[in-house]
Amino acid sequence: MATLSKKQQTQKRHKRLRRHLNGTNHRPRLAVFRSNNHIYAQVIDDEAQSTICSASTLDKDLREKLKASGGSCDASMAVGALLAQRALAKGIEQVVFDRGGNLYHGRVKALAKSAREAGLKF
């Protein structure tokens, strides 16, 4: 049997995780996508199939403030804080964390930690 590439392993983990994770309007899903250069996070209501709020390293609000590249832990922390601020402004306090098949380490962990510190509960 052939070995899977890192991308295929991530996709396989994500499919397995999504079987158990589901966001509602009371407790939406915080989905994280990580690329080599950027990180993206969305708060999603799966019942209504809509994105409530989002943040990424490509946002104009963050681009000017970030001294490091979009693929750093510092940038991930800034994205987590911005996303938590936007979610709290819309009245969302609790979310279900969907790491998107990525390992809970590095940039994904930094985003989650800063979102928790900014007031989101998960």
Curated annotation (Swiss-Prot):
Which GO terms of type biological process are on file? Answer: translation
Keyword annotations for this protein, in alphabetical order, are: Ribonucleoprotein, Ribosomal protein, RNA-binding, rRNA-binding
Q: Spell out the Basic residues composition-biased ranges.
A: 9-27
Pfam families membership: Ribosomal_L18p
Q: Which InterPro entries does this UniProt record tie to the protein?
A: Ribosomal_uL18_bac-type (IPR004389), Ribosomal_uL18_bac/euk (IPR005484)
MF terms (GO), sorted A to Z: 5S rRNA binding; structural constituent of ribosome
Q: Which family does it belong to?
A: Belongs to the universal ribosomal protein uL18 family.
Subunit and partners: Part of the 50S ribosomal subunit; part of the 5S rRNA/L5/L18/L25 subcomplex. Contacts the 5S and 23S rRNAs.
* HAMAP family, per database record: Ribosomal_uL18_B (MF_01337_B)
**Name this polypeptide is given:** Large ribosomal subunit protein uL18
Organism per entry: Prochlorococcus marinus (strain MIT 9211)
- Gene encoding the protein: rplR
